[in-house]
Amino acid sequence: EVKKANKDYSDLCNAIEMNYIDAVKPNQAHTKNVKKVDEHVNINKPDFNLKEYDFTDGLITNKSNILLATTNADCILLMFFDPIKKAIANVHSGWKGTLQRISVETVEKMQKEYGSNSKDIICCICPSIRKCHFEVEKDVQTLFENEFKDLKLDEIIERKSENKWLIDTVKINEEILQKAGLRKENIIDCGICSVCNSDLIHSYRVEKEKYGLSTAIIGLK
């Protein structure tokens, strides 16, 4: 499995004319922790499964020899690019990360480290589970209702049945990023649901314990 994953990364990097050994991936743990990457830890292989990136769900860099990677199987992945300061970020935002506003944490980190202006930052939302399939019970619904009182709750939380709710975590991220200063037109959502398209994209909800992982990768030329 590890060999296949490494080959998949290598094939992807070759396809986009980037160097596989430049890849860095955090050990995602549904946190709001975002780390800056200035240099590689390994010399001749990617920086995967390193203690330096434990409990980390977002990475930022302004180095052209570093590729930032994240993986998902329903969770939201967001890629950020500041064309003015030449800085990028790659973020894993599952429902727990969304509750902790890791996307906003990332913007603030780019502002602090690189002097980014939020109005310049472009964000791409990758394929992920959508409201049509993100079904939760009362305990999780309450967490979202309490955290996002500043948003229009009727647009992001929909009651499906007596004990089930549908939550639009993509819209939540779009809204909180706009509140953080990103322009609406700079938030680009692919509009693809991983559950609806599980024949093309890995989905934990569909594949269960045999689930695979999709990846998002971004680098500066």
Residue ranges of model-derived segments:
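Active-site microenvironment for binding and transforming phosphate-containing groups
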Residues: 1-221
